[in-house]
Amino acid sequence: MPLPQPHDLTTLVLRTDFGDDAAWEALCAALDGADAYPCATPVSDPRFAGAGIQALLAEESAAGEDERICEVFLADATALAGPEHPLLAVDLFTEPGRTFRVPVRWYPEISANLSIANMDFAEYADAAGPSGTFRGFGDD
């Protein structure tokens, strides 16, 4: 079964940790408040509980060409536990399985640029710091 499709000009935020509903609600509220325009399609489906990167890649590779998405942002235990809600960005297309973390503060910029193909996943992943977290391009 393919991954859910994000709404137009947004990217998919997929919940994989179901241990704290309040943390999920806080993350969704942070995403809603991060930008004046919707930038996320949050999906909370228990079938993705504990889903790892390889399982998501397998699901996506089995999807039809017109059902595939290029990236997904995971709301995993780390994202739900941290005050910055660092989502795990996963490349599903160019370099399948490549990841970096992105705090909600930078999510709207990344989502917008990826959804219109203004920038690609690698540009953000390459700019991630030593911890693997993207915190802007240095002039932000």
Where is each model-derived feature located?
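Short helix/strand-capping turn motifs
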Residues: 1-122
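Short linear, low-complexity motifs centered on an aromatic residue
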Residues: 132-140
